[in-house]
Regions:
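Structural motif marking the loop-to-transmembrane transition
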Residues: 1-5, 54, 104, 108, ...
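Sec-dependent N-terminal signal peptides of Gram-positive bacterial secreted proteins and lipoproteins
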Residues: 2-23
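A broad, structure-centric signal for solvent-exposed, well-ordered loop/edge residues
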Residues: 8, 41-42, 50-53, 61, ...
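Intrinsically disordered, low-complexity regions enriched in Ser/Pro/Gly/Gln/His and often acidic
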Residues: 12, 131, 393-394
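Residues in and immediately flanking transmembrane alpha helices
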Residues: 15-16, 72, 300
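Active-site-adjacent loops and short helices of periplasmic peptidoglycan-processing enzymes
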Residues: 20-186, 196-199
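Domain-terminus/edge residues, biased toward the C-terminal soluble/receptor-binding domains
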Residues: 168-169, 176-182, 186-412
Length: 412
């Protein structure tokens, strides 16, 4: 693989911007993280790798697996779900947020709405039972999915995030009576990112301040939505979480300045007279992100980078210009003067005939201005580079000669 390395001096001088320095900002929560979803870049973190109770934020994993089952054709939004005695009886427990389930039969779509809008625990359990047959088997699916995402240190005991004390005899085998689901803020960001990127339709539900369930109006627990007490423009999700152990927690998401931002605030610092501490902390964190980071397009779709080319075997032309498959965008700190390298790697094997749009190389951005681990993805940002045009096959005598030269070179 042929590599060409260039150095990019990322200097952002945006007029009169006076960014808040990272060391000067402290989110009002015990644990927190903020990321840009499309790139996976970490923009802020605070004790983000410590596994702690996350309460109903757990339902994001549940919802992901429901959407996955829909994608796989196992169920659909209109599939009826029969409510078993376990989730039905839980609706009478005042310690668990819920909706009435007296009809004992609802669609997947209705239960998704109840789960995401009003954080209905029985709705989540009913979905878990529909997908896996039992909540126990569903929890095993949740664990497997987290392993697939590289999350190794989570504790999962149910599909809802409730404390086991609320569930009576329906607790996960081998778990303790007071166990709760635990993930780190870092891991929650991974969950939220996977959900939003794979199933963006979830935002059509989570952006609703209210919805209708079985003829009654249900209200969102996310008070940052429109017409809610802690409203902030642009917020379209995602999930609250509240237990005695988890405190007031919230995963928020919004698009600001072209960035799809995900914030995780766990165990917000509660203040007397302020029931919206988690939302205030989230808004302050978003202000910090908006003031300190920006999205930059380094190569536009269809453009090459520093005359990037790729070899073509047996073509009328020996090389083809490699261009960006789509806009190549990175997130950088405002005012940063950090040297970061861009590496273009051309694929070594591609033979004519070659069609325009065929991937012929990769562009990798080696970001040096990092917060914590830098990215929630395993690799640094990299992007496909494709052939700018078609390359036809060469005349047979040229191909014969090329093969002869390669044979001689290999044997000598």
């Amino acid at each position: 693989m042929k590599k060409i390395i260039f150095t990019l001096l990322t200097i952002f001088l945006f007029g009169s911007v006076n960014p808040v320095l990272a060391q000067d900002f402290d989110v009002a929560a015990k644990y927190a993280i903020a990321i840009e979803a499309n790139t996976g870049k970490i923009l802020y973190e605070k004790d983000a790798t410590q596994p702690v109770e996350i309460a109903s934020i757990s339902k994001l994993i549940t919802v992901y697996l429901v959407y996955e089952a829909i994608e796989q054709g196992k169920i659909s939004l209109t599939t009826p779900v029969e409510i078993s005695d376990y989730p039905y009886q839980l609706t009478t427990n005042s310690e668990a947020s819920n909706v009435p389930l007296d009809a004992r039969n609802y669609t997947v779509e209705e239960l998704l709405d109840a789960t995401l809008v009003s954080s209905a625990n029985s709705a989540a359990i009913a979905l878990a039972e529909k997908v896996a047959g039992s909540e126990k088997d569903f929890v095993d699916m949740m664990k497997a999915k987290l392993q697939e995402w590289g999350i190794q240190d989570a504790t999962l005991v149910n599909s809802t995030g409730l404390n086991n004390e609320t569930l009576g005899d329906n607790i996960y085998p081998g778990s303790k009576k007071d166990d709760e689901n635990k993930l780190s803020a870092y891991d929650v960001a991974i969950v939220a990112r996977n959900l939003i990127l794979k199933y963006p339709q979830v935002l059509e539900i989570t952006k609703k301040p209210s919805s209708t369930f079985a003829g009654m109006t249900i209200t969102s627990t996310n008070y940052m939505l429109e017409d809610m007490p802690a409203y902030r423009g642009g917020i379209d999700g995602l999930k609250t979480g509240t237990t005695d152990k988890a405190g007031d927690s919230f995963v928020g998401t919004t698009e600001e300045k072209g960035m799809r931002i995900i914030t995780v605030v766990l165990n917000a610092n509660t203040q007397a007279g302020n029931p919206y501490s988690r939302f205030t902390a989230t808004s302050n964190l978003l202000d910090y992100i908006s003031s300190n980071f920006a999205l930059q397009t380094i190569i536009k779709q269809g453009e090459s980078y520093q005359d990037s080319k790729a070899p073509v075997q047996d073509g009328k032309e020996d090389t083809v210009t490699a261009v960006a498959k789509e806009d190549i965008q990175i997130v950088q700190r405002l005012g940063s003067r950090v040297q970061s390298s861009i590496t273009y790697s051309a694929n070594s094997q591609q033979a004519a005939p070659l069609e325009a749009g065929t991937v012929v190389g990769r562009l990798t951005y080696d970001d040096k201005d990092l917060v914590g681990q830098g990215y929630v993805t395993s690799d640094r940002p990299s992007f496909d580079m494709v052939a700018e045009k078609n390359v036809e096959k060469a005349f047979f005598l040229k191909i014969w000669w090329n093969n002869f030269v390669r044979y001689v070179n290999d044997k000598l």
